[in-house]
Amino acid sequence: MDHRLLEIIACPVCNGKLYYSQDKQELICKLDSLAFPLRDGIPVLLETEARPLALEESHS
């Protein structure tokens, strides 16, 4: 994941900051407790493709 891209993209739901999870290959929005997948290194920033984070995931 290109860190320059991470600086300019935002959560499509709340426009909040996204955090990269390298081990899960996801972009995390802590405000909405959503995880957006990366497919072939490309962020899929669609709310319908996001998975809800478990409570323990959203606080880490």
Curated annotation (Swiss-Prot):
Cross-referenced InterPro entries, in alphabetical order?
Trm112-like (IPR005651)
- GO CC annotation: cytosol
Q: Into which family does the record put it?
A: Belongs to the UPF0434 family.
Provide the protein name. UPF0434 protein KPN78578_09190
Species: Klebsiella pneumoniae subsp. pneumoniae (strain ATCC 700721 / MGH 78578)
